[in-house]
Amino acid sequence: MMTSVGTNRARGNWEQPQNQNQTQHKQRPQATAEQIRLAQMISDHNDADFEEKVKQLIDITGKNQDECVIALHDCNGDVNRAINVLLEGNPDTHSWEMVGKKKGVSGQKDGGQTESNEEGKENRDRDRDYSRRRGGPPRRGRGASRGREFRGQENGLDGTKSGGPSGRGTERGRRGRGRGRGGSGRRGGRFSAQGMGTFNPADYAEPANTDDNYGNSSGNTWNNTGHFEPDDGTSAWRTATEEWGTEDWNEDLSETKIFTASNVSSVPLPAENVTITAGQRIDLAVLLGKTPSTMENDSSNLDPSQAPSLAQPLVFSNSKQTAISQPASGNTFSHHSMVSMLGKGFGDVGEAKGGSTTGSQFLEQFKTAQALAQLAAQHSQSGSTTTSSWDMGSTTQSPSLVQYDLKNPSDSAVHSPFTKRQAFTPSSTMMEVFLQEKSPAVATSTAAPPPPSSPLPSKSTSAPQMSPGSSDNQSSSPQPAQQKLKQQKKKASLTSKIPALAVEMPGSADISGLNLQFGALQFGSEPVLSDYESTPTTSASSSQAPSSLYTSTASESSSTISSNQSQESGYQSGPIQSTTYTSQNNAQGPLYEQRSTQTRRYPSSISSSPQKDLTQAKNGFSSVQATQLQTTQSVEGATGSAVKSDSPSTSSIPPLNETVSAASLLTTTNQHSSSLGGLSHSEEIPNTTTTQHSSTLSTQQNTLSSSTSSGRTSTSTLLHTSVESEANLHSSSSTFSTTSSTVSAPPPVVSVSSSLNSGSSLGLSLGSNSTVTASTRSSVATTSGKAPPNLPPGVPPLLPNPYIMAPGLLHAYPPQVYGYDDLQMLQTRFPLDYYSIPFPTPTTPLTGRDGSLASNPYSGDLTKFGRGDASSPAPATTLAQPQQNQTQTHHTTQQTFLNPALPPGYSYTSLPYYTGVPGLPSTFQYGPAVFPVAPTSSKQHGVNVSVNASATPFQQPSGYGSHGYNTGVSVTSSNTGVPDISGSVYSKTQQSFEKQGFHSGTPAASFNLPSALGSGGPINPATAAAYPPAPFMHILTPHQQPHSQILHHHLQQDGQTGSGQRSQTSSIPQKPQTNKSAYNSYSWGAN
């Protein structure tokens, strides 16, 4: 009952808390005071009076709006009381008051709780923080309530909120209202059920009872619900407010954006905050505003001990753990001080406020700030000027680090749990906040910096290098820096603003990929961050250096870094897009955590390992990981770090060049990406590079290639970026990691991932990018040698974007091989892979089909037979037998067949067709066995194309394997199964129709399928288009078109387009045409 009640109530309440309360709870139709209050709270309409009160509160107390609103709610609109509560704190945190002073159906707690409304509020606030801190878990505490709680969450309200609604309802203190009411057993039950329990640990305990009560007192609960329902709504509303940053990190980020970076929030209004918040806040504000000395003073104010060495204090207070913060050492400078102030302010505030805010929220904010700070730091470093202001803050890294990185470092100290996450984010949050508040520019720059950050393994050193001067200068004149910042902010703002939001946004509403990343941020990030942690500074520092780079990026002055950053710099980052995703990683700082895996930013240094971890965590590819590491470094190297780093992979490629170029590419790409959002476009740029790098790529990447590829890829990856598949990213990243990890993954992915992400992305991209992508991709895939890996991992990805992917991959294989006919090329490709002989036997292929039937790949008779078969049902049967053979043969013979299968292109068509290919019963028969493969094929078909080998496994475990390569052949591959199946029939058909297509009706022609197709192709294609002969064309069209496009892309890329296109098109179209006449009459008719 509990459940049902809870559920209904939860749902109903959430959906229409008041109505339900009143309507469903007929027991108490009239609105209770609490319900009314809830309704008011829930009400969306703006209450001028209330707003006025809130403004008054804000002005008087200097607290942020959320706090004031909450306090007002808690105080039932009593401004004076709210002021006292805000300024003095609710002493009554532990008592509750029932708004309606409802009769205590839940008499248990009602009386006592009622008395201490304030206490309840306090509790609620505290609990709210707790809930934020604890988030769901506490809420989970109540079993039944969960439904409600979850609902609350769904609503964007916290479960707690839900709870609140029931009990707390009105009170912002979720607990308070809910509690007051909830106090009663029913309330408790409800409370629990709704997640009120979340707020109070005590409630927790009670909740169990409450839950029971909830169940037992369903009636009560309902009544209460009736009463409380509004609470639910209200609580939800309120909670939502409360929970914003709390429940989701994403939300936190948004909060940060909001400025509510809890601590940071003050930044925008430092003065107010200063006034409001602990000295720290003031300090922060002052610091931001003031000169270093001021900052120092502030710092002193904040932390006398800190004042002396702000940097340390900064570090110290902020991080609790000076060491890392130190990374900011360059940052240590004055601005470091400032940072320290900021950091401290953040840290303390964060901690203090964070406590109230919620560890998670706080952390989140911090992370964001930290990431931002890092960005800023990087940014500042890179452009001292730019970051100056935030340099200070940015010193960021320090600040961010300081703020949170320090904290991060401190993480061990204070937020160790959070730290990991915080590692980047804190900055980012803060930064974000700052950025948002302070300097969108920063945000932008910030965004960019992070990627750079990663590049800079040098960490602080690097950053500091850049930074130091900057830092010093900045520290000398923080204000000027700020001004700069502001200017920058304005400057960047324009572009950045969006990015800033985007960057932050991703935190909250990243794409799933981003979210994942973000999540990774959380889970992955922990490990990563961990590494991060180790290198938090690094990361931060990295950021810093990169930051410089970043800025540099623009100038790329730090080439080394620059590249790195550049790619990142992608200011892209800046913008954002990356931000978005990639903001790239730039944004990534935060993003990095968030999504970023990627890399590239990876922080390289930072991240190599983190990335690695990340990768591991995400990808699970160990090798990749390793690679990744390498790569990462490579990336670093490639990226810019390369320079340093890791040359490893890349050293060979001149990381710098590459880096630069890559970076440039990347950057460009990134920019593209950002601009494009794109991605694909960016990819194009890299395209060339990519291609050439593909091989390299495969080398792994070679950093170079990776980089370059990556550049291109990166873009795409970025684009999809990472495609979401973080893992992919990672993995590919590892491949490319270098390049960008991100990208790399996609491309090579890679293969897999790429395919996945990229694939789809690419696919998207592919369209535009496809060529590039394809080639890159395929190169990558091949090069990567990840084909096989792709296969397994990639395959699925491939499947998703088989066509797109396939083309890319496909062309990857065949492009060079066969420029003439797609078909031949594909065939060749396949055969080459599997059968060199078949390759030459385009003719044979037909025969091959027959051969398949006969198990004789090259059998003129068979071929003839095949034709006959096509017409006669018997052949179908034969086919059926061969089918098995063919399945097996497929690999072998059929491979040949497959090669010819290109023609089977129709078959392929048929394959897709095959479903609808009525005329091809044989095909159908044939198909079924193959079909299973076929489906894979068809899914894979792109894949196959893309990853022949890998496709192979997918397509046919046995037969398709060959096919796999054949896949290149294209769709055919996928067709292959069907084609194979219908191979005989089809072969015949093919021949027949080929003849028809050829119009010469020569079997040879069919053998010369490419020629025939080629010749006929052009015509046929038209025909094909024209001939939508029923299913054939029909399916053909879909498959074929994609194939054609893909193939064509491939071909085009390969430069085989003309011939290839024709061939393929012709083969497929012809087939349809032929099918129509020959095939249809033959196979379909016969069959």
Curated annotation (Swiss-Prot):
Regions of compositional bias (Basic and acidic residues) in chain numbering: 118-132
UniProt feature coiled coil, ranges: none
Pfam families from the UniProt entry: UBAP2-Lig
GN (gene name): UBAP2L
Biased composition (Polar residues): 390-401, 570-656, 1068-1087
UniProt keyword Cytoplasm present: yes
Role according to the record: Recruits the ubiquitination machinery to RNA polymerase II for polyubiquitination, removal and degradation, when the transcription-coupled nucleotide excision repair (TC-NER) machinery fails to resolve DNA damage. Plays an important role in the activity of long-term repopulating hematopoietic stem cells (LT-HSCs). Is a regulator of stress granule assembly, required for their efficient formation. Required for proper brain development and neocortex lamination.
PTM text: Acetylated.
UniProt keyword annotation of Acetylation present: yes
Protein name: Ubiquitin-associated protein 2-like
Species per Swiss-Prot/TrEMBL record: Homo sapiens
Disease: Neurodevelopmental disorder with impaired language, behavioral abnormalities, and dysmorphic facies: A disorder characterized by global developmental delay, speech delay, variably impaired intellectual development, behavioral abnormalities, and dysmorphic facial features. Additional features include early feeding difficulties, failure to thrive, short stature, mild visual impairment, hypotonia, seizures, and distal skeletal defects of the hands and feet.
